[in-house]
Amino acid sequence: MATVQKSQHSHFFLLVGCIVHLSNFCSTTTAQFDYFKLVLQWPNSYCSLKTTHCPRTRLPSQFTIHGLWPDNKSWPLSNCRDTSADVLKITDKGLIQDLAVHWPDLTRRQRKVPGQKFWVTQWKKHGACALPMYSFNDYFVKALELKKRNNVLDMLSRKSLTPGDQRVDVSDVNGAITKVTGGIAILKCPEGYLTEVIICFDPSGFPVIDCPGPFPCKDDPLEFQVLSRRKFQDL
């Protein structure tokens, strides 16, 4: 009986210690995550939104990366503490050029030598949640790998869903993606534009899994533009 009471007292003081010193007593040094969300955006739709300004004369003619987000099914992950000793700078010139093509900042003018602040911000907000499984550099390599392995524009074109004046149905877009990946994707369609496609993966990046939702797009026809209706100017 005395042993049981002693154990209960120990748990009580541990709980009190956690409450008083939560930041350094009970916190884990690394974030755990259940799955990856690869968020891809269609540039013409994204740059057509009323709240978006894209100062580029030419937009990419492919889906580009918005982000690679580690996440949990029980609670959302973001702004995880970076406990690594990595210097937050990409030194591989080939990787930088690859990111400039596949993960550009559409709200900034295109440059011959891309700045890295945009990608570092993505790491701090989302990528660090993938530690310790993925380092700073590995995180961007994985994002590019998943994006190249899942060509959404090609998936849609196989079902004759191509950018243009004709609208596309949400169910048709979902069906075309599931047909190839085997998983249920999430679509984002603000202002009636097919703007984002989110594909979910096991933490290793394989296989594709069903995204847990929510699924914000109603089953209404969406605009999938080949040319933006907004005017762009190179600043």
From Swiss-Prot:
It comes from the Eukaryota. One of its GO terms (biological process) is RNA catabolic process. One of its GO terms (molecular function) is RNA binding. Its EC number is 4.6.1.19. Keywords: Disulfide bond, Endonuclease, Glycoprotein, Hydrolase, Lyase, Nuclease, Secreted, Signal. RNA binds at Q41, H66, D105, L106, R108, F118, K125, H126. It catalyses: a ribonucleotidyl-ribonucleotide-RNA + H2O = a 3'-end 3'-phospho-ribonucleotide-RNA + a 5'-end dephospho-ribonucleoside-RNA + H(+). It is found in: Secreted, Extracellular space. SUPFAM superfamilies: Ribonuclease Rh-like. GO terms for cellular component: extracellular region. Glycans are attached at N72. Disulfide bonds join C47-C54, C80-C129, C189-C217, C200-C211. The active site is at H66, Q122, H126. CDD domains: RNase_T2_euk. Belongs to the RNase T2 family. This is Ribonuclease S-2. It comes from Antirrhinum hispanicum (Snapdragon).
